[in-house]
């Protein structure tokens, strides 16, 4: 190792306070007579802290990096209404890693290991887990125009606080949602392969993802008396296979650029009392044109869906068109969302054989929407080169058990 440069690359601390105020009313009527009346009120407070730091030391042809991250939170929730309960949950996650990267001619490699501790407590129940997790990245550059890269990593997935609550919430006259404080962490095996090729105006890439989760925290539905209980448990396994191809051309005559990507999502979800497979084909295409002071952009994509447990979540299906004109530092344009469509919808479908359901949200206002855009670019004073932001920590999980479907 010849020559070195040492620095603390990034530091980031975030403190969060989340106040939950959630009321829900549900009624069922039969021949105008009230048959079911459910009211739930949730009041909650969550305090959390996240701190992270990254250290790097660069050598002539290699780099050594290390980091540490700590997250801790306290959550207090009160449930009132048709059913009442109080919860007080504490959790902490600490992880540290070390990674070494280098290159040998056309071959680049990176190996690392992460050590972590996860802890959760709710009225004496919970878990404490220590883990040692490896990761690797291998890249081979065939030339300046083509390369192949493999990345592999083992990680842990912690249960959501909302699923760990020792609480029950009525959904309707036949269903109840129940938390599970005995949930344990699951193991995630992640593998990705990238192949890129570029020549002239043409570029293409092949992406392949395979992910396997062992004992994932997935939903479970069973019958208890006259009610169907929806809860979360450590199930058997979950797998995802995702090949994707992207092709780009341009800019043609420094005016037109075209891009299209398409892929398949295949899911295999295995629970203790269910097994589902699902395949989804998706695409996204876009075109960008720029001539003198005019520019235009068009994008279209279909549903890219996700399947987890027994629930199919539908992605967005939309198209977008925009045209703009630039005069000095002023940019004026018009944009339209779904100008050639009649309706916009997103939703989900549950395939439980005991209590299947469908949920759709229709937003007609999101079709044939037109908007004017206006921007003014200005700068003054000294200019500084901005550094890449590598750390982005946030906590947006309130830790409350939802009562809706």
Protein language model features and the residues they cover:
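Transmembrane beta-barrel strands of outer-membrane/channel proteins
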Residues: 13-21, 66-72, 111-117, 150-154, ...
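Surface-exposed extracellular loop regions of Gram-negative outer-membrane beta-barrel proteins
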Residues: 65-73, 90-125, 129-137, 255-259, ...
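Outer-membrane beta-barrel signature, preferentially recognizing the C-terminal barrel domain
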Residues: 144-146, 156-205, 212, 230-242, ...
